[in-house]
Amino acid sequence: MTTVDKRPSSRGYGDWRLSDIPQYKDGISTYEFVRATHEADYRTHQAEPVAGRTFGFNGIGRLTEVALHMPTKYTLHDQSSQYKESPSFFQGLMGVPDRGPVDLAAFQRETEELATAFENNGIKVHWVDYPEEPANPYGPLMGHVFLSWGSIWRGGSVISRFGFLPGMVGVSEYLAKWAWNTLNIPPLVAITEGAMEPGACNMIADEVLVTCLSASYDQRGTDQLVAAISKTSGTEEFHNLQLRPAVEGFFNKATGACAHPDININAIDVGKLVVSPAALDWDARTWLYDNNFELIEADPDEQREFLAPCNVLLLEPGKVIAHADCHKTNQKIRDAGVEVIEVTGTEIRKACGGIKCRVMQINREPGPTLADVRNRVWR
């Protein structure tokens, strides 16, 4: 990726010259200049120069920058007036085991622990605050602790179209505004059809995205996301591995299948994935096999109990952050030669998510490609 380290505002107003315009050269014709402008790459010609920096969590390279939200009393979904009106309605949508109310003090300690883990690994941490009593046009915000809804792709932020949670409407817009106002990162696209929750998607190589067809995604929304981020990925190829988990709402306690890709599968190293077998249909498993991926299967009990053993966050190939109480799965990951940094995730799972879900990933370095995976010798 091109590194942009000088914002236009650092130049004196009278210091600009025609040579500062990328497409300009002495003697260029009007037609040649216009055509060159039309053909310029959006990410390297516009988005990154506007931001004055590189950004995007595409791929599985080293993670360098994130954002978190410190929970407040307004972060607790079960304290929402709408939730109290019909807890069974929301519990039916989510389907996860009920572990009781969220302990705010413990939730804040978990957040500090996670931030410390990032900082100890050289990752810059930003903090996102919401207004007092945050609400959208339909009621109080719910689930806005999950800053993955504001995750930044190469090219810019993406506005979600949520599949089934009315309390999330407006969250990705707010986080996109935060990214623009705080980091100068522009929006890339808004999903306007169907359903697409990009923050719960993930990548298993520099040019391989994982999505689902589920309560959170349909084909219309998926097509719109893939069309946008594939054009700004900076890779010659771009693949979308589409899972089809058997689940009506968010989570199926009987099987452990989830509507979100990042609860079902995540990269832990070059060509190594931690997976929930219940979410892998035949086509997905065949594609992974044919492309030389090694599958580390999560412990089925930990997956069904929504301990979120697959919801690890890759810091760099061969190093992940994981939930501390996923003992069996974490050992399997270690046995695969991967370093596991364990942090507490008790309260975030009560809020129906995991460690990876709550992190806005702002920037990753370019990392291993699908060619690297295909060339790996392991079987």
UniProtKB/Swiss-Prot annotation:
Keywords: Antibiotic resistance, Hydrolase. Signal peptide: none annotated. The active site is at residue 357. It catalyses: 2-nitroimidazole + H2O = 1,3-dihydro-2H-imidazol-2-one + nitrite + H(+). Optimum pH is 7.2. Pfam families: ADI. One of its GO terms (molecular function) is arginine deiminase activity. Belongs to the arginine deiminase family. Involved in the biodegradation of 2-Nitroimidazole (2NI) which is a natural antibiotic and an analog of the synthetic nitroimidazoles used for treatment of tuberculosis, Chagas disease (also called American Trypanosomiasis) and cancer. Catalyzes the hydrolytic denitration of 2NI to produce imidazol-2-one and nitrite. It is also active against the 2NI synthetic derivative benznidazole. NnhA confers drug resistance to 2NI. PANTHER family: ARGININE DEIMINASE. This is 2-nitroimidazole nitrohydrolase. It comes from Mycobacterium sp. (strain JS330). The gene is nnhA.
